[in-house]
Amino acid sequence: MKDEKSAGNDARRVGEEGLFDALAEDNIQTLENCDFQHILTTDPHTYNTLRNEYPSKGGVYSVKHYSTLLMELIHSGEIEITKPLNIKGTYHDPCYLGRYNGIFDAPREVMRQCGVELLEMPRNRTNSFCCGAGGGQVWKKEHEDMKQRPSENRIEEALQTGANYFTVACPKDMTMYSDAVKTSGNEEKMIVRDLVDYVAEAMELEKFTNEETKETMSESFKVEKDASELQA
């Protein structure tokens, strides 16, 4: 969508109602000029905002999270799983996908169809544990007395399941937990992966193997590190 802006979730969560209203108004105007049936989003926060908060502003849409679409396409045969992965993974329920909107089964079904054995953490579904980024916290400075980040606590919980893969279905979760495995010293024990990566690998699509993903990420971190050293 041309001229797409943030849906406004983070603005509203930190109390910027005026900014949220402005973003919603702009997006609704833009969407009025688009020909579509559904809005697809990879972000549970955006999903919740568009589905539950835009209607009061005049924006009523059919909104889907990508995990639901993936499940539907797999069940219909439009996505063909040709190489089951045969790995062990756990799944983190995003707050705004699970507790707020009741989408628990679709991501788990996608994992199952891709050949991922699901090992549940004790805190799952409605009792899931926040990654620590919600409510605008991702933009705030951490408290200096904090002994352990919520995301690090969650990684430790995941390790107890015996899983090697930590599955996410939210971009904030990917950021928080990718960082947490490093800061907690668990890079060699747990790999954080997005749900769609399983589908791509199980479909044997190129450019989505875990080795290539890790190599790309490593190169990205190297470039950032080199840049910061040059600035210093």
Model-derived features: where do they sit?
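Iron-sulfur cluster-binding electron-transfer modules in prokaryotic oxidoreductases
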Residues: 1-232
